[in-house]
Design a protein with these regions (language model features):
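Extended substrate/RNA-proximal surfaces in nucleic-acid metabolism proteins
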Residues: 1-77
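Charged catalytic cores and adjacent phosphate/nucleic-acid-binding surfaces used
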Residues: 58-156
Length: 156
Protein backbone atom coordinates (compact mmCIF):
# COMPACT_ATOMS: atom_id res chain seq x y z
CA UNK A 1 0.00 0.00 0.00
CA UNK A 2 1.31 3.45 -0.91
CA UNK A 3 0.85 6.31 1.57
CA UNK A 4 -0.46 9.48 -0.06
CA UNK A 5 -0.66 12.13 2.67
CA UNK A 6 -3.41 14.24 1.12
CA UNK A 7 -5.44 15.33 4.15
CA UNK A 8 -4.93 15.70 7.88
CA UNK A 9 -6.85 12.72 9.27
CA UNK A 10 -9.91 13.01 6.97
CA UNK A 11 -11.04 14.81 3.84
CA UNK A 12 -14.38 15.50 5.49
CA UNK A 13 -12.98 18.00 8.00
CA UNK A 14 -9.62 19.18 6.70
CA UNK A 15 -8.41 20.82 3.48
CA UNK A 16 -6.22 19.16 0.84
CA UNK A 17 -2.51 19.62 1.54
CA UNK A 18 -1.73 20.01 -2.18
CA UNK A 19 -3.80 23.17 -2.59
CA UNK A 20 -4.35 24.58 0.88
CA UNK A 21 -0.99 24.52 2.64
CA UNK A 22 -0.40 28.24 2.99
CA UNK A 23 0.51 28.58 6.66
CA UNK A 24 3.03 27.26 9.16
CA UNK A 25 0.15 25.55 10.94
CA UNK A 26 -0.75 23.56 7.82
CA UNK A 27 2.92 22.64 7.32
CA UNK A 28 3.00 21.31 10.87
CA UNK A 29 -0.17 19.29 10.29
CA UNK A 30 1.34 17.88 7.09
CA UNK A 31 4.52 16.79 8.87
CA UNK A 32 2.60 15.35 11.82
CA UNK A 33 0.32 13.26 9.63
CA UNK A 34 3.16 12.15 7.33
CA UNK A 35 5.21 10.95 10.27
CA UNK A 36 2.26 9.27 11.97
CA UNK A 37 1.37 7.46 8.76
CA UNK A 38 4.92 6.26 8.18
CA UNK A 39 5.16 5.02 11.75
CA UNK A 40 2.13 2.74 11.34
CA UNK A 41 4.21 0.31 9.32
CA UNK A 42 1.30 -0.18 6.92
CA UNK A 43 2.83 1.48 3.88
CA UNK A 44 5.52 0.56 1.36
CA UNK A 45 6.54 4.18 0.71
CA UNK A 46 5.45 7.80 1.12
CA UNK A 47 4.08 9.26 -2.11
CA UNK A 48 5.02 12.83 -3.08
CA UNK A 49 6.44 13.74 0.36
CA UNK A 50 6.86 17.34 -0.83
CA UNK A 51 3.17 17.71 -1.77
CA UNK A 52 2.84 20.79 0.46
CA UNK A 53 5.01 22.72 -2.01
CA UNK A 54 2.22 22.70 -4.60
CA UNK A 55 0.57 25.48 -2.62
CA UNK A 56 2.99 26.86 -0.01
CA UNK A 57 4.74 29.21 -2.42
CA UNK A 58 8.34 29.40 -1.26
CA UNK A 59 10.63 27.00 0.50
CA UNK A 60 11.35 28.83 3.75
CA UNK A 61 12.90 27.84 7.07
CA UNK A 62 9.67 26.23 8.24
CA UNK A 63 9.54 24.07 5.11
CA UNK A 64 13.15 23.08 5.69
CA UNK A 65 12.41 22.09 9.29
CA UNK A 66 9.39 19.92 8.51
CA UNK A 67 11.15 18.43 5.48
CA UNK A 68 14.05 17.42 7.67
CA UNK A 69 11.66 15.87 10.22
CA UNK A 70 9.89 13.87 7.50
CA UNK A 71 13.11 12.77 5.80
CA UNK A 72 14.86 11.88 9.05
CA UNK A 73 11.94 9.71 10.12
CA UNK A 74 11.67 8.06 6.69
CA UNK A 75 15.37 7.26 6.77
CA UNK A 76 15.18 5.78 10.27
CA UNK A 77 12.16 3.70 9.27
CA UNK A 78 13.83 2.62 5.99
CA UNK A 79 10.80 3.96 4.14
CA UNK A 80 11.41 5.09 0.55
CA UNK A 81 10.15 8.49 -0.55
CA UNK A 82 8.51 8.91 -3.93
CA UNK A 83 10.11 11.36 -6.33
CA UNK A 84 6.90 12.16 -8.18
CA UNK A 85 7.44 13.43 -11.72
CA UNK A 86 3.81 14.06 -12.64
CA UNK A 87 4.01 17.81 -12.12
CA UNK A 88 7.32 18.52 -13.87
CA UNK A 89 5.72 19.67 -17.14
CA UNK A 90 3.38 21.99 -15.20
CA UNK A 91 6.27 23.35 -13.12
CA UNK A 92 8.29 24.11 -16.23
CA UNK A 93 5.38 25.67 -18.11
CA UNK A 94 4.59 27.97 -15.17
CA UNK A 95 8.12 28.64 -13.94
CA UNK A 96 7.54 27.18 -10.48
CA UNK A 97 9.37 24.68 -8.32
CA UNK A 98 6.52 22.61 -6.89
CA UNK A 99 6.67 18.83 -6.82
CA UNK A 100 9.30 17.46 -6.94
CA UNK A 101 10.90 20.34 -5.02
CA UNK A 102 14.69 20.58 -5.31
CA UNK A 103 15.20 21.91 -1.77
CA UNK A 104 13.18 19.06 -0.27
CA UNK A 105 15.26 16.52 -2.17
CA UNK A 106 18.55 18.09 -1.09
CA UNK A 107 17.39 17.53 2.50
CA UNK A 108 16.36 13.97 1.62
CA UNK A 109 19.88 13.36 0.33
CA UNK A 110 21.40 14.87 3.47
CA UNK A 111 19.25 12.60 5.66
CA UNK A 112 20.20 9.44 3.76
CA UNK A 113 16.80 8.74 2.22
CA UNK A 114 16.03 6.25 -0.52
CA UNK A 115 13.76 7.19 -3.42
CA UNK A 116 11.39 5.49 -5.79
CA UNK A 117 10.36 7.38 -8.92
CA UNK A 118 6.62 7.69 -9.24
CA UNK A 119 4.30 8.83 -11.98
CA UNK A 120 0.69 9.55 -11.11
CA UNK A 121 -1.64 7.98 -13.64
CA UNK A 122 -3.72 11.15 -14.04
CA UNK A 123 -2.36 11.73 -17.54
CA UNK A 124 -1.52 8.75 -19.76
CA UNK A 125 1.05 10.78 -21.70
CA UNK A 126 3.32 10.87 -18.66
CA UNK A 127 3.16 7.09 -18.48
CA UNK A 128 3.87 6.67 -22.19
CA UNK A 129 7.13 8.62 -22.11
CA UNK A 130 10.25 7.66 -20.20
CA UNK A 131 11.55 11.23 -20.43
CA UNK A 132 10.66 12.32 -16.90
CA UNK A 133 11.52 8.98 -15.34
CA UNK A 134 14.99 8.96 -16.87
CA UNK A 135 15.57 12.57 -15.87
CA UNK A 136 14.46 11.83 -12.30
CA UNK A 137 16.90 8.94 -12.03
CA UNK A 138 19.73 11.23 -13.21
CA UNK A 139 18.75 14.03 -10.78
CA UNK A 140 18.54 11.64 -7.84
CA UNK A 141 21.90 10.09 -8.76
CA UNK A 142 23.45 13.57 -8.85
CA UNK A 143 22.17 14.09 -5.29
CA UNK A 144 23.54 10.71 -4.21
CA UNK A 145 20.10 9.34 -3.38
CA UNK A 146 19.75 5.59 -3.95
CA UNK A 147 16.80 4.72 -6.19
CA UNK A 148 14.77 1.54 -5.98
CA UNK A 149 12.65 0.45 -8.92
CA UNK A 150 10.32 -2.02 -7.26
CA UNK A 151 7.84 -1.55 -4.46
CA UNK A 152 8.96 -3.31 -1.31
CA UNK A 153 6.46 -5.88 -0.10
CA UNK A 154 5.67 -6.83 3.44
CA UNK A 155 7.17 -9.98 4.82
CA UNK A 156 4.95 -11.68 7.35
Amino acid sequence: VIFGNHFYRTDERYPYFGSDTRSAEMLDLYAESAIRGMETGLYAYLAHPDLFMRSYGRFDGHCARISREICRRASRLHMPLEYNVSMIAYNEAHGVAGVPHPDFWRIAADEGCTAIVGIDAHDHRVLESGLYYDRAVRELAALGIPVIDTIPFFEY
